[in-house]
């Protein structure tokens, strides 16, 4: 099974190289966003959302972990985040994504992976599944392809609609000063020392 999962991840790397992060047109991005709204994801944040954000993430990604930490402050004031799991960083990224998706309480599993993240090893905190369900692997594959079709070379990658309904997309960890504009919410004070260099 480990060999199979490794082959899946290798396929993601090869696919990424082939796509070479082409930038879609505004019209194509609208169509991609419609697909994104239906993508398999872990929903976290406000029940009565004032703003909705979609984030592609790899469970082993350091900058995804930092993005999660930053967005917690905005979730407290009305942000809802759809965390869309992909797998490309490590052979066990598929297993970690599956561990979150197949958990009874997905949001709790996502939080555990983030809180227990090991920055020294670039590893998520959740134990990867050795035998993910085939349908789970297919969903993670589909998410990864969708992210690449948006033009993102890696994670994190954020997608959202502004108040006028225009689709926006950003690859990489946003600066803290950008988060108010991205979420459409008042700027939040973030004192996390690990995020200080991203102001």
Residues of each region from the PLM?
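Extracytoplasmic thiol/disulfide redox context detector
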Residues: 2-5, 10-90, 131-154, 172-199
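Thiol/selenol-based redox catalytic cores and closely related redox-interacting motifs
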Residues: 89-179
């Amino acid at each position: 099974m480990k060999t199979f999962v490794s082959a899946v991840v290798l396929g993601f790397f090869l696919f990424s190289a082939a796509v070479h992060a082409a930038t879609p047109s505004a019209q194509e991005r609208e169509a991609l966003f419609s697909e994104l709204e239906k993508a398999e994801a872990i929903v976290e944040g406000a029940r009565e959302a004032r703003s909705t954000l979609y984030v592609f993430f790899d469970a082993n990604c350091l900058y995804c972990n930092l993005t999660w930490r930053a967005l917690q402050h905005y979730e407290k004031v009305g942000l809802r985040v759809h965390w869309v799991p992909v797998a490309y960083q490590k052979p066990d990224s598929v297993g970690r994504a599956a561990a979150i998706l197949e958990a009874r309480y997905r949001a709790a599993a996502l939080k555990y992976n983030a809180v227990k993240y090991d920055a020294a090893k670039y590893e998520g905190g959740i134990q990867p599944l050795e035998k993910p369900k085939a349908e789970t692997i297919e969903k993670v594959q589909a998410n990864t392809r969708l992210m690449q079709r948006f033009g993102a070379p890696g994670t994190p990658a954020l997608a959202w609609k502004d108040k006028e309904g225009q689709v926006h997309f950003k690859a990489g960890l946003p600066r803290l000063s950008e988060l108010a504009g991205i979420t459409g919410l008042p700027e939040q004070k973030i004192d996390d020392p690990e995020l200080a260099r991203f102001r």
